[in-house]
Design a protein with these regions (language model features):
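Active-site anion-handling motifs in enzyme catalytic cores
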Residues: 1-230
Length: 230
């Protein structure tokens, strides 16, 4: 039985947004992505690599040898990926992940490079675009077209991100919303209470803080709920 399971085992790499961050939203999204990947690949060898820290050679080798590598949510894409490194990756890193096990002499063989690209699948899983920005730079277009798989569908969290990728020539993309929402089936939603509770959970954004508006919101919540959790 174990031998049969190992035959179906897939090496799955997760670009994990929770490494080197205190943003609790990233943990929620990462957990949702893990549930999705477990459903798709019940038997898997799972490896997590960072998105906020630059990848080591070991991490890049894991990506290059994986059956699939998934970018687990959050707004990692940006219009200027040279300067705004929400996803801390460079063009050279992208090439290393997709061609790293080729010998230097083989890098001149475009057939081998094409075959290697076809074997390395880096796929977006509910990923979004950082804020609302100007048109993407030529560097951003090049790095994303080098990084992202051209065979499988990419899942992005909103229509804005999908349109950005379409304009870059990346057409195998669907607007699926955030993976945290994928479990909100009709049956699940029917179980959600419709009456007002006595306790409420809220969050505050630290990287775009608005102290005055935050204080107004917290005051209002304290007025209407017995307990407020932040």
């Amino acid at each position: 039985m174990m031998d049969q399971e190992m035959q179906h085992c897939r090496k799955i790499v997760r670009f994990d947004p929770t490494i080197s961050t205190a943003n609790q939203g990233d943990f929620i999204i990462r957990n949702a992505c893990e549930h999705v990947l477990h459903d798709c690949f019940p038997v898997q060898l799972s490896v997590a690599v960072p998105v906020r820290d630059r990848l080591s050679k070991v991490s890049m080798k894991h990506v290059g040898s994986a059956d699939y590598a998934f970018v687990c949510g959050t707004n990692l894409l940006s219009s200027d990926m040279r300067r705004q490194r929400m996803w801390n990756i460079r063009l050279r890193d992208a090439l290393m992940m997709r061609c790293g096990d080729l010998h230097k002499r083989e890098l001149l063989n475009f057939r081998l490079i094409r075959e290697k690209f076809q074997r390395t699948h880096i796929i977006l899983l509910g990923t979004g675009w950082y804020q609302y920005q100007d048109e993407p730079t030529g560097y951003t277009k090049r790095i994303l077209k080098t990084l992202l798989d051209g065979q499988y569908l990419h899942a992005v969290r909103d229509e804005y991100t999908r349109q950005r990728l379409l304009k870059l020539g990346i057409t195998n993309v669907l607007n699926t919303a955030c993976p945290t929402m994928w479990g909100l089936t009709a049956d699940k939603c029917a179980q959600i209470p419709t009456h007002k509770a006595e306790r409420v959970v809220t969050t505050l954004t630290d990287y775009r803080s608005s102290p005055e508006q935050d204080a107004q919101m917290l005051t209002m919540l304290q007025k209407h709920y017995r307990e407020v959790y932040v």
